[in-house]
Every structure is written in structure tokens, then in C-alpha cells.
Amino acid sequence: MKFFVDTAETAEIAELAEAGLVDGVTTNPSLIAKSGRNFLEVVKEICDLVEGPVSAEVTALEAPAMIAEGKKLALLADNVVVKLPLTFEGLKACQALTAENIQTNVTLCFSANQGLLAAKAGATYVSPFIGRLDDLGVDGMELIANLRMIFDNYAFDTQILAASIRSADHIQQCALLGADVATAPPSVLKGLVKHQLTDKGLEAFMADWQKTGQSIL
């Protein structure tokens, strides 16, 4: 499974990339707006920080404008993935951009039918939103499982990019169900390494080592 970090904060991206914890980045207009910086400049800077895919979302609502924005974003760097909403217009734009060998991430997927349409439109990634489904009392993991079955049944190349990840448990469940990618905030990705028994074991090791009075260096 690949890990993408869901943020537009370049300092956080650089830290995680240096540690080798991320394979790519996802952004959206809301995340970039919080930075107060120029949209295109932020996307370009992120693309320079990581070698993997960087999802940058269009803001237009009609297919022709989405396509134009997507082409402009794709010119920023080779690793740009154009993020499109899962609407009728978004699917038309996806098909057009895919035909020009531009990678796409069709986002805001909340049903297996939507995901199937995105795959048929040639999406590189489809992003089912787990946490937001859970908020409605719907099991988001059922969507991951259904998409995995459908994509395998018909040999779609579209990758399942699990989004709206809220916890380490979400990532574990997505991994067990066969999601190709999980994108999560920096805090969730960093939290994957934490376990109380690891901390307790390290504390005991260090206490024993201190008693020896030795130093490796």
C-alpha cells in the first residue's frame, strides 16, 4: 500500500518525505486556501518536494473549463495528477484528460456506482471518502471492499485512493481490504508508528543501558 499525505503545508510534506514515509501528496482548494499563498506556486513547490504523484484540484464546474485548468496544472510538473469532482462534467473532463495521457484523480466518491463510472472514464485514481460516510452512519469500509471487487472483476487499472482517513485503524482496514493508496493528514501518518508497548519496551531498554555506564559513540 502507498501512503499519500493530505496537506498543502510544505514544511510538513518535506519532513515526511525526508523520513521516507510518503509516496505522494493530495491537496484540495480548501487546504491550499489556508496557506494564504498563490495556488499554482504552492502546487509547484510541492511537486519539487516529492517525486511521487501530487493531486491538484480544478475549481471549474463545467467540463471545458475543467479540461483547460487540468492542462494548465499538468504543465507545472510531470508528477501532477489532476483532481476532478465525481460529477457528470467531471467524468467528461476525466475522459478527455486521460486521452491526452494526463493522470487524474476523481474525488468525492461515495458509492460503488460512482467509482465504477470513474474507472470507465479512465481515472488513474478514484478517491472514496471513508470518514464522511462514517459520519452519516454508513460503513465506509464497505465501499472500499465493493470497489476492490468491481475493479478486480473487470480488470480496471484505476487505483483506489482511500481518502477522508481519520485514524490509524482506518488505514489498517483499508490495507486489509486492498486499497491501493491511503491519503491522510500528517498527524495520522505519524501516529501509525505509535504503540504503548513500543514506548514501554524502549523505556525499559534505555533504563537498563544507562545502568551500564557505556556509550556506543
Swiss-Prot record:
Location(s), subcellular: Cytoplasm
Biological source species: Maricaulis maris (strain MCS10)
Biological classification of the source: Bacteria, Pseudomonadati, Pseudomonadota, Alphaproteobacteria, Maricaulales
Example of a GO cellular component annotation carried by this entry: cytoplasm
Pathway given in the UniProt record: Carbohydrate degradation; pentose phosphate pathway; D-glyceraldehyde 3-phosphate and beta-D-fructose 6-phosphate from D-ribose 5-phosphate and D-xylulose 5-phosphate (non-oxidative stage): step 2/3
Active site: 83
Residue intervals passing through the bilayer: none
Broad class of enzyme this protein falls into: transferase
A Gene Ontology BP annotation from the UniProt entry: pentose-phosphate shunt
Family: Belongs to the transaldolase family. Type 3B subfamily.
InterPro entries: Aldolase_TIM, TAL/FSA, Transaldolase_3B, Transaldolase_3B/F6P_aldolase, Transaldolase_AS, TSA/FSA_arc/bac
HAMAP family, per the entry: Transaldolase_3b
The name this protein goes by in its record: Probable transaldolase
Catalytic activities: D-sedoheptulose 7-phosphate + D-glyceraldehyde 3-phosphate = D-erythrose 4-phosphate + beta-D-fructose 6-phosphate
Keywords: Cytoplasm, Pentose shunt, Schiff base, Transferase
Gene Ontology terms, MF aspect: aldehyde-lyase activity; transaldolase activity
Gene name, Swiss-Prot/TrEMBL: tal
Function, as annotated: Transaldolase is important for the balance of metabolites in the pentose-phosphate pathway.
Primary localization: cytoplasm
The protein's Enzyme Commission number: 2.2.1.2
One protein family per Pfam: TAL_FSA
